[in-house]
Amino acid sequence: MDHAADRHRTDLMTITRFVLNEQTKHPESRGDFSILLSHIVLGCKFVCTAVNKAGLAKLLGLAGETNVQGEDQKKLDVLSNEVFIKALVSSNRTCILVSEEDEEATFVRPANRGKYCVVFDPLDGSSNIDCGVSIGTIFGIYMIKDGHEPTLDDVLQPGMNMLAAGYCMYGSSCTLVLSTGSGVNGFTLDPSLGEFILTHPDIKIPKKGKIYSVNEGNAKNWDSPTSKYVQSCKYPADGSSPKSLRYIGSMVADVHRTLLYGGIFLYPGDKKSPNGKLRVLYEVFPMSFLMEQAGGQAFTGKQRALDLVPEKIHERSPIFLGSYDDVEEIKKLYAAEEQN
């Protein structure tokens, strides 16, 4: 490749250009959604820089506070949360923000208010910060139900009502994966340009994968269908090769690998945590939305994940998501359990 020539290319598909192209498909659009996405992208760039400098800037370690989930807050968590709140409010396109780090939803003051609700986890996998494992930001976007004064009901909607969802992974490269409801596309940050470039157009998850991803440390507390499924991954009844176990412990990294290579990601409910650990609004819904848009499935153990109607902003749910055929297998095990 001629890197010197590549440096001067201006025909690259940047995320801004991509979003504007999508906007032209909706003649009635006023550009509000594009402006909101540009502010989310800016927040991701800012957090990416902070993550890269974290060790040098002494941002690692605890901030001495705990968040609503009872988890110790990292300094980077606090910073990332502030970055996204400010970026979203300053877009003048949002009315309600729900963050994993804040106990209450943030209602934007009327002067800065728009028609979108954004749910987000500013820094998922933050327990991995100190050891350099990939971490990320997860987000989902809803529109308020109508022109009334915004209430919590505007965010307590089923995942299938989401307009867009995505995540930004801060790892060996900074990758932003986005769906606006018509497929999934991946963008990689070019540090020399400061731009996200389309590198993974129209991502489709393989129909069946060779990898399963689950925390087996919880195995003694699993229900029967989960135990049977993991057993079948290790010892297939048909004598075929077993699936490989890959588990990082950072949802963004585990789901990203599942999306690209196929397979299944599981965070089941168990005796200790019947509702699982992952939060519905800003973890389960965005990742399930992306999986379905890429041709996969997402299941809670009882129903399609995107059909869930949350009652609280920090509600949790079990989740099984990934390749269509792999999720279909665990759905059959739960169906058989129900019949017994």
Curated annotation (Swiss-Prot):
> Where, by residue number, does Mg(2+) 3 bind?
D121, D124, E283
Q: What class of enzyme is it?
A: hydrolase
Q: Which domain of life is it from?
A: Eukaryota
Which residues are Mg(2+) 2-binding?
E100, D121, L123
The subcellular location is:
Cytoplasm
Q: Which residues bind substrate?
A: D124, G125, S126, S127, N215, Y247, Y267, K277
Q: Which Pfam families match?
A: FBPase (PF00316), FBPase_C (PF18913)
Does the UniProt entry include the keyword RNA-binding?
Answer: no
Arranged from A to Z, the UniProt key words for this protein are: Carbohydrate metabolism, Cytoplasm, Hydrolase, Magnesium, Metal-binding
Q: What is its EC number?
A: 3.1.3.11
Q: Which NCBIfam families does this entry report, sorted A to Z?
A: PRK09293.1-1, PRK09293.1-3
- Extra information: In plants there are two FBPase isozymes: one in the cytosol and the other in the chloroplast.
The name of this protein is Fructose-1,6-bisphosphatase, cytosolic
User: Which species is this UniProt entry from?
Assistant: Solanum tuberosum (Potato)
